Amino acid sequence: MAKYVKTEQGYQEIEATVAPMVGEKMNANNPVGTGSFSMGRKSGSVIGTNSHAEGFNTTASGERSHTEGASTTASGNSSHAEGASTTASSNSSHAEGMSTIASGEGSHAEGVSTLAEGNSSHAEGNTTTASGNYSHAEGVNTHAEGNSSHAEGNKTNARGKNSHAEGDGTIASSTNQHAQGRFNVADSHNKYAHIVGNGTNLSIRSNAHTLDWNGVPWFKGRPQFGGTAQDQGSQTVMANGDKEIILASSTANSTKKFKITVDDSGAISATEVI
């Protein structure tokens, strides 16, 4: 016989077989039940075996699933949905927060409008997407597309397998690549292991520094060697195919710098940099 419980929404049917029973009460010394249980389950929704639905307008249709909050759905087996308008649609998935979706097997979505669709993926923050298997997206509007990739910050995209993108609007498009800074130029040919972007926005991209897989660095500006980041000691400059070396004076407390050049005869000259 169906049993009912009074809630704020009126009388709700409890789809459960609870034993042992004493009248209409569970035995406090042995509160064991089998079957499904609901308080606030969405009317007409599918009831999963051994599922539990509570809150308002919730659906626990997966076997052994649990849903709570408002308008949440746990349709995957052993899934869990909580919060508001969240969906855990795959087996062993977990969705929490607001308007989040965990559609990958064993995935976890939390925050606001996040999507964890890769198997064992994790999406958190606001409007993030973890579509690669074992991927992780966090921050705001980030995308972890490659398997085992990680995207964090703001509008970053980790497209390559095992890639990592961080900062603002960066793209790590190749396997095992790392991109940081802001708005770098995407490298789809896997030339670089490391990229530091210094672009202006999503439409105006540029790089400050790259490092290729042979360990060869490139710098947009003049690299600094020695001294400190504040005093900018000696410098090495490569521009227009010519090589110049700028060295700080070795005299104590001197602030002078000299440009060292070598001509075709091998003669070396030093000119003070004003």
Q: Residue spans of the language-model regions?
A:
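Periodic small-residue-enriched repeat registers in elongated scaffold domains
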Residues: 2, 16-225, 229-231
